[in-house]
């Protein structure tokens, strides 16, 4: 069943689109969009890339590109970049996700009730970190990055 059909049966849900520059969110109540509850957070994956690249350069004296970060996050700890580099990337990504979810919580979204639908390329990239955070009880991921 498509995600939207499921949303119509839920009292409330929030859609989070993690993009390059921002993470946009929109609340849905009983299948209806609530435009009074939509905004953007300054939590796009480009910020994450920049944090990781800076930390890797200063701490490990290594120059990572965005494609390197993507490869590590999509492969997990068993990447070919080495344990130290992979651990740094994984840690920074988890901190980034925790900050983003904390910002949503500050905006009065209870992520442990209802559904949180993650869309966009950033959501696919950070899926493991979102699931590992323990802050979202029922995450739903839309894998098609063009679906939003």
Name each region found by the language model:
Residues 1-13, 32-46, 68-74, 79-116, ...:
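Nucleotide/phosphate-binding catalytic cleft detector across ATP-hydrolyzing
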Residues 10-20, 25-30:
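PRPP/pyrophosphate-binding module of the type I phosphoribosyltransferase fold
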Residues 19, 122-123:
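Short glycine-enriched loops at secondary-structure junctions
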Residues 24-66:
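Glycine-rich phosphate-binding loop plus the immediately following alpha-helix
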């Amino acid at each position: 069943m498509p995600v939207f059909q499921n949303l119509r049966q839920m009292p409330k849900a929030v859609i989070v689109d993690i993009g390059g520059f921002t993470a946009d969110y929109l609340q849905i109540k009983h299948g209806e969009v609530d435009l009074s509850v939509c905004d953007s957070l300054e939590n796009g994956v480009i910020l994450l890339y920049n944090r990781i690249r800076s930390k890797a350069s200063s701490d490990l004296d290594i120059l990572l590109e965005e494609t390197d970060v993507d490869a590590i996050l999509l492969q997990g700890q068993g990447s070919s970049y080495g344990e130290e580099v992979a651990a740094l990337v994984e840690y920074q990504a988890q901190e980034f996700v925790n900050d983003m979810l904390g910002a949503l919580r500050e905006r009065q979204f209870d992520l442990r009730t209802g559904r949180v639908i993650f869309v966009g390329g950033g959501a696919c990239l950070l899926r493991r970190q979102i699931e590992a955070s323990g802050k979202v009880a029922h995450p739903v991921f839309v894998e098609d990055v063009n679906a939003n």
